[in-house]
Structure formats: C-alpha cells, structure tokens
Amino acid sequence: MLSDELKLLVGLGNPGTEYEKTRHNVGFMVLEEIARKNNCSFRESKKIFGRTCEYGSGIEKTRLLMPNTYMNESGKSVRLAKDWFNFQNNQLIVLVDDMDLPLGKIRVRSKGSSGGHNGLKSIINHLGTAEFKRLKIGIGAPSNDQQERKSKTVSHVLGRFSKEEFIILNFIIQEIISCIESITSNNWEKISTRLNSYKPDN
C-alpha cells in the first residue's frame, strides 16, 4: 500500500456500549476487525474527539479513526484528524452504513453527495468538499413501503444484526479488509470494481 493513496481510514458510528454491533456502527465494526488483525489497540485522543489506532510503519503507516462525537458530528473529528496528521482528502476513506443497499452489497464512490446520511453530511460540511472516497456497506431497509420505512428507520439502524445477518456481514467485512490491504496508488478503480460487484457467495 502506497502512502500517497491511503493514510486514514474512518469508520462511522456512535460511541458507547449501547450502540455496539448495531447496524449504524458497521463502520466501527470493520475498523475493529482491522485493528484485531494487525494487533493494534485503539486509544482515546481528546484533541481530535475520537479513538485512534495505527498499523504499519514508515510510508506504509495507516491510521484508523472512530469519532467519539456521535454520528451527526462525525465531520468535526475527521477534520481535526486530517489537520493534525496533515493528510489530504484523497488519502482518506470513510466506511459507512447504507440503508439503500441490501445487506451483502457494497458500493464504493470517490466522491458524491451524502445520500441523506448524517455522518457523511457532517464530513462534507467540515471538509468543505464532497470529494473524498467512501465505502458504503449495505444494511438493508426495514420496509419497501416509504411511509413505513420512514417510521422504522431509527429503530432499524440502531438495531442489531441477527445471527444469520452476521454471517453475511462477516463475509463482507473480510472482503473489505482484503481489498483495503491491497490498495496502491494505481489500482483504486480495480478495487472499486471488485467491491461493487462482490456477492457474499462468491
């Protein structure tokens, strides 16, 4: 992995044990697995309002960030981390849940709107741009009916995955980690295509 391509991985979620393993915290879950695989531990960083962890060395060092600001203020932590560690927007990847995608699907984008996601909206506002990479992880919607979906959105995203869903999610997390570990400065499009077309039974 080349240093000019990836320096900071941000997982979005809400802090606190009451939110652990909820659908909205799937970004946290990916980072926790990356940390476990690389034997690194998260530590509190008050100056950037988040928990950080780093792995690798030299030009291959990558930092992980889980904001402690709650989802709607995630951008505050991301901007502080970017400025403190002197990263550029193109060295950042945000991992986020997406209710518009079914469980088992991944969507990678190099830029774009928030899609109604408050965490992404906050990051866009604090960075002053929507031009940063984001990796959206499908969590499915509570209903196909728009009115019912709207009324159940909060309970759905703050709910936990079933045992069956966790099996699918684990495949997704491992595929994401495999791709992140192989990112270089000239294969982002290839990685994006691989993730966008991934199916858990591949």
UniProtKB/Swiss-Prot annotation:
Task of the protein = Hydrolyzes ribosome-free peptidyl-tRNAs (with 1 or more amino acids incorporated), which drop off the ribosome during protein synthesis, or as a result of ribosome stalling.
Per the record, where is site Stabilizes the basic form of H active site to accept a proton? D97
Q: Which organism is it from?
A: Prochlorococcus marinus (strain NATL1A)
Q: Name one GO cellular component term.
A: cytoplasm
What is this enzyme's catalytic activity, as reactions? an N-acyl-L-alpha-aminoacyl-tRNA + H2O = an N-acyl-L-amino acid + a tRNA + H(+)
What name does UniProt use for this protein?
Peptidyl-tRNA hydrolase
Looking up HAMAP family in the UniProt record yields: Pept_tRNA_hydro_bact
Highest taxon of the source? Answer: Bacteria
Its principal location?
cytoplasm
Family of this protein: Belongs to the PTH family.
Record localization: Cytoplasm
Return the InterPro entries for the record.
Pept_tRNA_hydro, Pept_tRNA_hydro_CS, Pept_tRNA_hydro_sf
Question: Record's Pfam families?
Answer: Pept_tRNA_hydro
Instruction: Kindly indicate whether the keyword Cytoplasm belongs to this entry.
Output: yes
Name a single GO biological process: protein quality control for misfolded or incompletely synthesized proteins
Q: Which GO terms label this protein's molecular function in UniProt?
A: peptidyl-tRNA hydrolase activity; tRNA binding
User: Which positions does the site annotation Discriminates between blocked and unblocked aminoacyl-tRNA cover?
Assistant: N14
User: EC number(s) on record?
Assistant: 3.1.1.29
